[in-house]
């Protein structure tokens, strides 16, 4: 088991979730409150939640499986933000900031999954 609060990928995912809650969700149109806004909310907090849940598992294999789920959620968030950009709910500038964060989290998750699946050989995360 790992202390998830010490994991850089969790820290980044947590800050991203806070950013989405504070800066993106409040500007979403009212008509999307029970549809797209809820889906973005769930997918966004699913990323750090899966990291947390996986960190409580006893094996690297199990932890990596939860990180796979977190990675899937990043892909879901990635598309949701393409959609709200194309619907003009957010500006291109806001999208670029969000997309950069999502890509950083994805890269961190992929590296961590590889690290766990390779038996922690020759790498430090």
Protein language model regions, located:
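Short, C-terminally biased terminal segments at protein or domain edges
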Residues: 1-125
């Amino acid at each position: 088991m790992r202390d998830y609060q010490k994991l850089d990928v969790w820290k980044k995912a947590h800050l991203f979730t806070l950013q989405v809650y504070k800066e993106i969700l409040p500007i979403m149109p009212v008509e999307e409150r029970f549809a797209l806004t809820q889906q973005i909310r769930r997918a966004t907090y699913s990323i750090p939640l899966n990291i947390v849940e996986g960190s409580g598992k006893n094996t690297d294999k199990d932890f990596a499986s939860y990180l796979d789920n977190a990675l899937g959620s990043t892909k879901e968030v990635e598309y949701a933000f393409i959609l709200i950009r194309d619907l003009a709910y957010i500006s291109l500038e806001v999208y670029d900031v969000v997309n950069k964060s999502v890509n950083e989290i994805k890269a961190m998750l992929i590296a961590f999954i590889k690290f766990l699946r390779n038996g922690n050989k020759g790498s430090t995360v």
